[in-house]
């Protein structure tokens, strides 16, 4: 579930952004953006010149200088406004999160158990390791792990999802988040963070972006823009002696206007806004990124590790067939399978019970009346079952049952091996059922591949992204599902160590890897991956290891995360192309106007046939300011994104933003020149 999206130009945000734009006129704020700092200095210089001209202290056209000065200030203000609007949208999202963080008291237990004596303390004084009790109606005061109890928890304030979730001690559902509310029962929680370090605190700090650090690509682009600015600054400085030597020195106001129009002010004014907006779009998808670096890395990812269950398949495997071993009838197998599944509350376990009912009218037995001992599934044993009336029935993976049979002095039948292979080749998961040391047969669990997922993987392949399916299934089952889903590769019988080794292998090849995870056993791989999306429903260890948290706990979101990252990089690249292409058109407007009096041959460059030198220069400066405003929606929303190969994407962007960057200024400057002339302003 995504959060409610703010309108692009929300009136309250626009008003606040205008105020912030004025505040950002101070030198300290401007210094952070070297390109716009040059414009700020030019604005200050031309303001002083126009005042001197108006007072008679300097010769020249005071009105023209004042007009140039005014539009240079407007250019700075528009750049400030773009950044302030992006920050304002993020802060509005942060304010909604701050509403969750309430000052409250907590019941700090003196001993780590329910019923122990408790002290009432302010929630913001709780430290890592403190034990607290929360009951129905209470706000959970800190991030932590449930060490006792189980409760229904409303996490809508954090995730936006209205359905309550169960949090209980043990397993992967023991992690709780401060600011969420207990709906029923009680929990004893051990705080896992100190004040100011909670998940909610980190969300607010990230969203507000007050300490937002530039990403590597952003730093590289800033260095390029500074280099271009220095080149144009030196070029402009040398033009004054050339014009003076020709006998008609160009005014400082015109030189400043020329410099501002030539340096890449468009991308310089929008660069910060693009970065802030990228993180804001990620939050709009209900994904919290720890830094802009993580969002940027998502755009460079070329390997996706995707869990099979829930991402590639629907995740609710259903029993579809009972396949008895040689000498065993199907009803005997179904009866044993149903008994072994009576206490199994997983979707797979319930489907086995239902299939036995449907096929052989085997009604579900009363668990209490059986006087049986149920054996739960564990990651170590990889099987579950029941002990009843001297019968020991188990169901589980092929390898686990094989070890169990051999440990009990039995022999695993060759015909069952063949049946297991047959089930696996069909893309189903085989579960083997055994009674004592006698193998009864195989249950086929069919998992359904999601509709349209094959087409999405084909699009990712076009973009040069390799998809790898991660599954605990055996190789035959994994190969069948991988072929059906259209992934490029797969890792079968995956263990945490195997995932980690696979990530390191791809990284050694120079690739960037993205993955999702939710369990403590995923933490090492999440920490190693370049883009690691932890599920909000997962453990604290997983969330700390990842550099993003998906509030919806939807593994499929990884594809959307990559989409947003690539869109941010494309937006930055497209607007940089547009900005640099702009300079060519402005060159044709200003150079003839500024130097035609000294060098008449330059009139040949006046292909736009602008009204006069003054109108040409002023039109270029006005266009330079207005284009920033027109591009703000594109910077905030991102450019249109289509899954294409790198070369096709480059060609498309060069046509749209390169050619567009050349043509738009020619048209815009000419229109502004006509308006100035018609209105008699020049």
From Swiss-Prot:
Localization: Cell inner membrane
Subunit-level organization: The system is composed of three essential subunits: KdpA, KdpB and KdpC.
KW Magnesium (keyword) present: yes
Matching SUPFAM superfamilies: Calcium ATPase, transduction domain A, Calcium ATPase, transmembrane domain M, HAD-like, Metal cation-transporting ATPase, ATP-binding domain N
Protein name: Potassium-transporting ATPase ATP-binding subunit
Active site positions, chain numbering: 307
Domain of life (superkingdom): Bacteria
């Amino acid at each position: 579930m995504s959060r409610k999206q703010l309108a692009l130009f929300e009136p309250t945000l626009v008003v606040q952004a205008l105020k912030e734009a004025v505040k950002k006129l101070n030198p300290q704020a401007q210094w952070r953006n070297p390109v716009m700092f040059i414009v700020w200095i030019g604005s200050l210089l031309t303001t002083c010149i126009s005042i001197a001209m108006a007072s008679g202290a300097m010769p020249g056209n005071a009105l023209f200088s004042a007009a140039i000065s005014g539009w240079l200030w407007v250019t700075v203000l528009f750049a400030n406004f773009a950044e302030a609007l992006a920050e304002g949208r993020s802060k509005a999202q942060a304010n909604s999160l701050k509403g969750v963080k309430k000052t409250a008291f907590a019941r700090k237990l003196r001993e780590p158990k329910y019923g122990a004596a408790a002290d009432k303390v302010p929630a913001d004084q709780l430290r890592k390791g403190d034990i607290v009790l929360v009951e129905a109606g209470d706000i959970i005061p800190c991030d932590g792990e449930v060490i006792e109890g189980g409760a229904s928890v409303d996490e809508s304030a954090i995730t936006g999802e209205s359905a309550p979730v169960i949090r209980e001690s043990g397993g992967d559902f023991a992690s709780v988040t401060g600011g969420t509310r207990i709906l029923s029962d009680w929990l004893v929680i051990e705080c896992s963070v100190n004040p100011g370090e909670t998940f909610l605190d980190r969300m607010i700090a990230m969203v507000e972006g007050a300490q937002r650090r530039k990403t590597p690509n952003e730093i590289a682009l800033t260095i390029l823009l500074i280099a271009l600015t220095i080149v144009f600054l030196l070029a402009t400085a040398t033009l004054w002696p050339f014009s003076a030597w020709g006998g008609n020195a160009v005014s400082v106001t015109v030189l400043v206007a020329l410099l501002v129009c030539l340096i890449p002010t468009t991308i310089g004014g929008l660069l910060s806004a693009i970065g802030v907006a990228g993180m804001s779009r990620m939050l709009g998808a209900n994904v919290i990124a720890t830094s802009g670096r993580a969002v940027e890395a998502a755009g460079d990812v070329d390997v996706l590790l995707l869990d099979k269950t829930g991402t590639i398949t629907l995740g609710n495997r259903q029993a579809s067939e009972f396949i008895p071993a040689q000498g065993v009838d199907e009803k005997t197998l179904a009866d044993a399978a149903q008994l072994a599944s009576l206490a199994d509350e997983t979707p797979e376990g319930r489907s086995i019970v239902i299939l036995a009912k449907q096929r052989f009218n085997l009604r579900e037995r009363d668990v209490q009346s059986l006087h049986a001992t149920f054996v739960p599934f564990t990651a170590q044993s990889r099987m579950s079952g029941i002990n009843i009336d001297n019968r020991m029935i188990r169901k589980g993976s092929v390898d686990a049952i094989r070890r169990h049979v051999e440990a009990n002095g039995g022999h695993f039948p060759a015909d069952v091996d063949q049946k297991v292979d047959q089930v696996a080749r069909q893309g189903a998961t085989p579960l083997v059922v055994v009674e004592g040391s006698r193998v009864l047969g195989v249950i086929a669990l069919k998992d359904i591949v999601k509709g349209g997922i094959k087409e999405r993987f084909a699009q990712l392949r076009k973009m040069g992204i390799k998809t790898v399916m991660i599954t605990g299934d055996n190789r035959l089952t994994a190969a069948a599902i991988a072929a059906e889903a259209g992934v490029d590769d797969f890792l079968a019988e995956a263990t945490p160590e195997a995932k980690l080794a696979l990530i390191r292998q791809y990284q050694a090849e120079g690739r960037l890897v993205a993955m999702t995870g939710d369990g403590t056993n995923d933490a090492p791989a999440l920490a190693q991956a370049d883009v690691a999306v932890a599920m909000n429903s997962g453990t604290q260890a997983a969330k700390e290891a990842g550099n993003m948290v998906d509030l919806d706990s939807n593994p499929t979101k990884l594809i959307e995360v990559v989409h947003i990252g690539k869109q941010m990089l494309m937006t930055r690249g497209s607007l940089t192309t547009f900005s640099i292409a702009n300079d060519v058109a402005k060159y044709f407007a200003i150079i003839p106007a500024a130097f035609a009096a000294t060098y008449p041959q330059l009139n040949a460059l006046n292909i736009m046939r602008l009204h006069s030198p003054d109108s040409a220069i002023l039109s270029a400066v006005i266009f330079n300011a207005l284009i920033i405003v027109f591009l703000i929606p594109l910077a905030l929303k991102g450019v249109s994104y289509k899954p294409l190969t790198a070369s096709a994407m480059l060609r498309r962007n060069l046509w749209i933003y390169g050619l567009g960057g050349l043509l738009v200024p020619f048209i815009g400057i000419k229109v502004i020149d006509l308006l100035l002339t018609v209105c008699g302003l020049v």
